[in-house]
Amino acid sequence: PVPPDPAWTELPDDGYVRRDGAVIAWRSPSSTSATTPFRLAGAHTDSPCLRVKPSPDGSAVGWKQLAVEVYGGILNNTWLDRDLGIAGRVVGADGAVALLNVAEPVARVPQLAVHLDRDVNSGGLTLDTQQHLTPVWGVGASTPGEFTSWVRGAAEMSSDPAWWELCLYDTQGAAVIGADHSLLASGRLDNQLSCWAATTALAAAEPVDHIAVAVLNDHEEVGSSSNTGAAGPFLEAVLSRIVAARGGGVEELARALAGSSCVSADNAHAVHPNYPERHEPGHRPIVNAGPAIKVNSNQRYATSGDTAAVFQRACEAAGVPWQVFVSRNNMPCGSTIGPITATRLGIATVDVGVPQLSMHSARELCGVDDPGHLAAALGAFLTE
């Protein structure tokens, strides 16, 4: 790790710097200068979820409840009737940070029985996120500070925590499924899968004439506008300091960025067998057929003809297939850190992603081969 506070006068060839939920790591060739360009593999660390509010203790008709806030665009119904653990950061009064992961089931959002909602299967399920997504975590009446005391014990802290950033998550582990073992089911595939691929690729990269970088931003699911998000200064600051550590200034940074390129990796929508009409007929990614290059003429994705060709060459060098994703004209598409990175730094960027089903569900689905396909393609991009 490279500490962020001291001057970066003797920067290691390989290093990383972390800021809260974001990480930037790099590998350098044996010989570099202040104008050596960068090749970046970007992803985001966050996923849609339920986050515990600062004062969560609540009770209703004999049940202990936790007040939670919806983070990002969750699929509401997928959080019902799941055994939920709690994980995140806990901050002490002295500023010390503890990481907490309670992997055993602690809470559950119970669905209303069909006997009490006779029209649910014909009229559809409607959930009020304030009223109907509140989990229970015990029986009886909650007392003020009860959750705080529980966190103190779970995190093995000597005093009550001053603050926390805690998420609920499905405790069911990842599983390879299908009679042919061709599918991978897990929570948070969007976008932990791409984070794994980027870091795996960086660890294996052997750059020759550029600096290989993995940038894992936070807060993409809520717009990226934070000091650790893609719209914030974190990446620009790190790249600027790498250039400065090699004796460069504003001019050298501009030259380094002008020769740089970025692959923004964030999962794509695989064609859904039950809803094929929701997909563009000529651009329907399938699982286990390689990463999809994402294209949007309205710049919701940063892909251009040049950058698409760069990623295609990386796939060919790695021996992995690739495909193309385009949204329907009558169905707006999402966006990624790609356009934000391209806008902030002027770096030529391509958006790609592993095809998956059930995006933003508490439990998602992709092909077992595609994580490896993406890691191999990113490895070739960071090395070639």
Walk through the language-model features, giving the residues of each.
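N-terminal hydrophobic/helix-forming segments and targeting peptides
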Residues: 1-384
